[in-house]
Every structure is written in C-alpha cells, then in structure tokens.
C-alpha cells in the first residue's frame, strides 16, 4: 500500500460556485521487475460550476500520475494487480478562470509470483524420506480486457440540456468455470441536467444497470479465486440525447476496462528430509515463499449519516442532485473469525439554498462524508493474514430533514479477500553419490539354516 498526493489546475472561465465534481482514478499500467513496480494512470475529472453570469458550465480534465513502488523481496517473475482510489479530494476556486484540485491517491498492489515452487516428490526409490503436505496458490492467468456497455435512461419532458453524466462500476460477483471467468456487477449512473423553466433549474436522474462479461482464461481451474478491478473510462463516456415526442431519451455508452488475476490452489507432497543407507547423498534445502487464498466475501451494507450546512443564515430549499463517486477504506483489521472494515463514502450534493442575510436564493453544493464501520464474518483467519479490500457504491438517497439538515442513506458493496503468505523449507534437489562401503561391524550374527549343525 502506498499514498500519493497529486495537484492539478483546471481551466474554468469566469467560475463562481463549484456545484459538482466527479473524479475517477484509473490505473493504466502496473508492472515491473526485481523489487520495483511502476504504476501509471490518469485521474479523469468533470467539474460542474456556475459562472459569474449565473450560467451552468461543465469542464473536463485529465491529470496523469506515475510512481515507483518498492515491493521488497518479490518473486523473480511476477504479475501484479493494482487498485487506486481517491482517499481525499479538495477543490477550490483559485482565480476567476481556474480551479485548483488536490487529490490524495491510495494504491494497493497485489504481487503474484509466477515462479513454481521447487520441490522433490516423494517417489525417490531407495531413499528413506520424511514427506510433508503443503497447500499453495498459483497464478493461473492475469490480464487486462477492454469492453463496452450501453444503456438508455428516460429523462422526461422537462429537459433543456444535459450538463453532467457520472458513473461508477461495482463488481457484485466473480466466478471461474471451465476456461472462463464471469464478472457480474452494476453501473451506477447519475445525470444532471437543466430544465426548461426560465431559471434553468437543475434536476437529476439516477439509474442502475446490470452488466455481465465473460473472458477466456488460460490454465483454467474450476472454483479458482479471482481478484478483479473494473473501471469506467470516464473521458470516453458518451451521452447522446434523442427527443421522442417531446420526451428526452439519453443513450449512454460506457467504455470499460477489467483487470483480473486468477489464482488456483493445489496441495503438493514434498520432502523435508532424506537419507540413504546404501549411498552417499547430497540434499539441497530451499526456503520458499508461497501464498494461499484463505477466503473471500462480497456483501452489501447500508450506511447513513446526517449533515448540517455550516452557514447559520442559510436554509435548504430543494435538493437537486446527489451521488457517491468515491469510497475510501481506511481500515481492514482481522478480529477473530471476522474482518473489521472501516471507511468513508463521499457524497456530492447539489441543492438550492436561501440566505436570510442577503435574501437571495442560489445553487450550492457540499461533499458529505459518510463514515461506516462493520464486521464481515470470515472463518479460518490468522492474525497476520493480509486483507485485500475495496468498496463501491450501489445506491444513495438524500432527503431534507430540517431547514439546515440532510439525511443521507446509502448502500455500498464490500469485497474482501484474505491471503496468507507462507514460508516453507522443502527439499529441492537430491544428488545420489557413491555407494557406501560394506558394513565392517565387530559383531556378526550367523543364523543356522535347516540341516546345518
């Protein structure tokens, strides 16, 4: 795991009020050799803001990042699967034409060794051996695949123009069967648009769509474990609106990327010692690192919070739009036969407010933090097992509780994998040398045969 800070400037002519920000980090490259991994990617950002004339404007931005991560004593040959999330983001109007963006990126890199365990099987004829059984996991396949999904959403009749479309992909289930990996999930989509009234009031439409993708994999093994990340390539997301008898229909194309590593499990029977009564032998022992997938769990969780706007003179009149664009897991801790998962979901909310001091109404926005803590049951864990976790949004609902308070209720999907790193010493080679000299013991026994005296 590693954290990186990133800054960028976004051109936003005549900006006055930031209304909504959707930022999606995508890891485009994760490879290396020895003990270093190079990661590269982009943060796609879309900013909806109100300019000094009261016009709603949208700007897009791409900010690149790169880093080198020291993973220690990794295997000579390895594949890696990386995930990156925004653990914090801050936007502010730097000048009349520029918005300053500050990101904090969290990287989580899983390294899968491609070197096979070196061992001698327990069929060495003429040797006295001490066998042992070791359960290990092996990398079967790792790849990045591109695919696309398309859906339609009915926006209704009161639509002037679409301003923003943000979407996140959530993996719900992964299975390996035959020579294929099946990835199932949902796309959570939120469209912000202007209405046809004189004030160009904002409105939004949220929708959820199922997706299912199958990919061919090498060295398939039924019941294998799979580690999967799915991204929406936000810079290429397309929305085409069609007016059908006065009602607006939005056609949305989602270019997507799936990164996966498929891991199988096998039990090997090897030797921890060997000796011979007839020959001189040379035994080579090798200490080897192996890993084993202990278990995994996918579970949906309900989370909620209550937020109060900071300005005392300001009251909430109407909520226009809300969506969760980012969830950061701050803690994954083993607690007996369970995993304690803690984190924060960030919800962007656009609403109309009234200021009693100025006696003016206007659009404003907040990013509300929804903290959560839950325990997921997972048996057979050791205290030093490694937990690989991520969280994705499923749905969110925001309602006005009082004039200055909002209730937020959301559902998120938690994906937890437990991996155990093991070190074992196995006999990796046996060389049989010269025959030992015949026995010259001082005491001999002679057994009298039948008919002898």
What do the PLM-derived regions correspond to, one by one?
Residues 1-453:
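Viral structural modules
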